[in-house]
């Protein structure tokens, strides 16, 4: 009987840990849109991706209530390459503010872009 109770308790703990539905970040429809751009980067798809970036940055949801990691950097780099250098650099710097662990990588990227 004791063995049965321990088995049930263990099963309950394991199953309850698998049922977590809360997410740290909200990705909206980032994945299919970014895949479509990677597959065929048409101007229309890039504009759609830019709208997704704006929504991810300006309307963050999820438990952390902040943009997902890498989004500010990706969007900043895209804007920089499209001629919006000042805005792009601001977003790259925001990535560092939000995720200090990205300082080395994003800092080097900023240095390369400013050359």
Regions found by a protein language model. Give the residues of each.
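Helix-turn-helix repeat elements of alpha-solenoid scaffolds
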Residues: 41-54
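TPR/TPR-like alpha-solenoid helical repeat scaffolds
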Residues: 103-115
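Structural register within alpha-helical repeat arrays
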Residues: 74-75
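Bacterial signal peptide processing site
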Residues: 19-21
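C-terminal motif of bacterial Sec signal peptides marking the signal peptidase cleavage site
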Residues: 14-17
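Residue signature of alpha-solenoid helical repeat architecture, marking inter-repeat boundaries
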Residues: 23-27, 66
């Amino acid at each position: 009987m004791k063995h049965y109770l321990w088995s049930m308790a263990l099963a309950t703990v394991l199953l309850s840990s698998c049922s977590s539905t809360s997410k740290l970040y909200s990705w909206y429809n980032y994945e299919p849109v970014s895949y479509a751009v990677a597959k065929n980067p048409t101007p229309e798809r890039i504009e759609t991706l830019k709208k997704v970036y704006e929504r991810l940055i300006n309307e963050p949801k999820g438990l952390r209530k902040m943009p997902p990691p890498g989004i500010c950097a990706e969007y900043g780099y895209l804007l920089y390459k499209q001629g919006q250098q000042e805005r792009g650099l601001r977003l790259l710097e925001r990535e560092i503010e939000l995720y200090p662990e990205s300082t080395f990588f994003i800092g080097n990227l900023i240095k390369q872009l400013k050359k």
